[in-house]
Structures are given as structure tokens and as C-alpha cells.
Amino acid sequence: MRNRSILVRVPASVGNLGGAHDRAAMALDASLNLKATRKSDDRLNIRYFGENGERVPRDRTNLMARAFESALRYRGLEFSGADFEVYSTIPVGFGLGSSTAAVWAGLVSANLLYGLGLDEQTLFDLAGIFEPRSANLHAAWRGGLATCESAGSGFDRTRVSQEFGLIALVPSHASQQLSVSPASGNGESTTQFRLAAALAGYLSRPDSAKPSLGYSGPVGGSEDLSAVAETLEAAGSASLASFLCGGGPVVGFLTRSLTPESALSVQDDLIRRGLARKVWSFRPANSGAEEWNDMAVTAPAPVELGEGVELAKAAHTAA
């Protein structure tokens, strides 16, 4: 008999890394941890413990629940009830991959709890229904750095040196109009591919020449962001690149050789000086949901791929 409970863990992820839009994302050492329990009363109970947890729906509009149901419907099963208990260190709603983690947690927990036998391609097809950021999906799944370096190619995984880190912050005086525009032309797309390739090379081999990454972020608050870069340099880590994390509002600063003690000092200093409303420090995570949850051993089971995904999409649309 299958277990009635399963524990699932998924890392945070940051997209638009170095300004590469959806061509590069990196897994981070924060995580969403879900204990999912099967029930037979058709009810969903969600307990969520984590920063900004009040933003997380406690009903079947919850992203984990919707992904969970989509996996069941793919196999022609109906939702019969579940308890979700979540402990997360991923801040919700700040462009740090909380939605990506929720999608993977829902799919992985359903796959393992019900023995659905969904293979990797099917899981990605289902995940793409709920999360359009492909780079984040790949980074959170495999860990490390996910990059797409040429048109028509898939995402490659690169292990990231632990010399690197990320300081992520909500600027105190940044423009409220924060957004990342997708690449709109061949020249712009080529730039994103180049940035992705440069990131993969440098973050895996820190002794190689530092590429030109530059800045890609909000227009407002440039003086404050320059002060952040100066603070990092004073702490012994020049900012290698600064960029809007995903769709914002968080701005990320890619760092190198910043010790945990120095990172805490930087966080305190930025808050004290009024340069940021919130600050987090992260390290790369070189493992992801696949390894953490032993998904590599999940054997694919025969199914009509198109039919199953269409059923899941229909369920998502109905929700």
C-alpha cells in the first residue's frame, strides 16, 4: 500500500540572472518543504509557515493544489482530499521562485504519493501550464545554473562555484514601475544568449576572466543602488552584476567571496542606512527537486501524452 504522507523539498530560484531574461536562472539555498497527506473526505487543508505566508491561498486556488490536481487528472484520477503542511524559507511574491517551487511541490508530491509514474517530460509539460518561466523551472528541478545559450536549444545545467552568492533586496526608493521586458528582436535575443553563456562559463570557473555583465534593473533609485554596490565593495565583494530578480520588485546583486558573516553585516548596514526595506542573502544550490526527492528513479509509464496534458490544461482553465 502506498504511503499516505510524503515529504517534498524544492529550492528557490532567481530568473533574469545577470539581465539574461528567461535564458538564465539559478537555484538558491532557500527551500519550500511540503508534507502532503492523502485524505478521502474531498477537503483540502493548508497550513503555511513562511515569510509573506498571508499571501498564500488556503483553498483549491492554491498553486500547489492546482498543480497537484493536474497530475492526478493527467492519470484520470479525481482529487479526493489532502492536507498540505508547508515550511518555506522562500519569500512569497518577491521574484525569488516561490511560485516555481509551489508548482514543483504540487506535481512531485502527487507523483510520488499516488505512484503516478510521470516521466520528466510530462512533469515539465504540466509545470509549464502554471509557470511560464522555463529557466526557473529548469533551475529548481536540477539545481545549479540553468542556461539556454542558442535559439532552439534546450536548457543546460551548470554547477555553480560556492564562491558566488546573491544579495537580494527591495530598494527603499526604487521606481514603482518595475518590470522586465522580454527580448523583442534578433539583436536583443542574441545579447541574452551571450549573457547566458558568459554566466555559465564564469560561475562554474571563477578563475576565468570576468565577463561584462552590467546592470539590468529598475530605472528609479539608481543612486541608492550605486550605494549598495559600494557597500558590497567595502565588505570585500564587488558587485559582479545587478538585475531585477524575475519580475521584481527585488533587485539582485551577484557577489563573489562574500563570507556569511560579511553578508549579515551588509544586510544590517543596508537596512540601517535606509537603502533597502528588505534584504536577503543566498548561496547557490547545486541540487534541485529531482535529486532531493529521488525523482531520477521514477520510471515513465505508457500514456497518451497529448490527451493527459489536455485534461490537465482543462482542469487548470476551469479553476
For the regions a language model picked out, list residue spans one by one.
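DPxDG-like acidic metal-binding loop motif
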Residues: 30, 96-118, 143
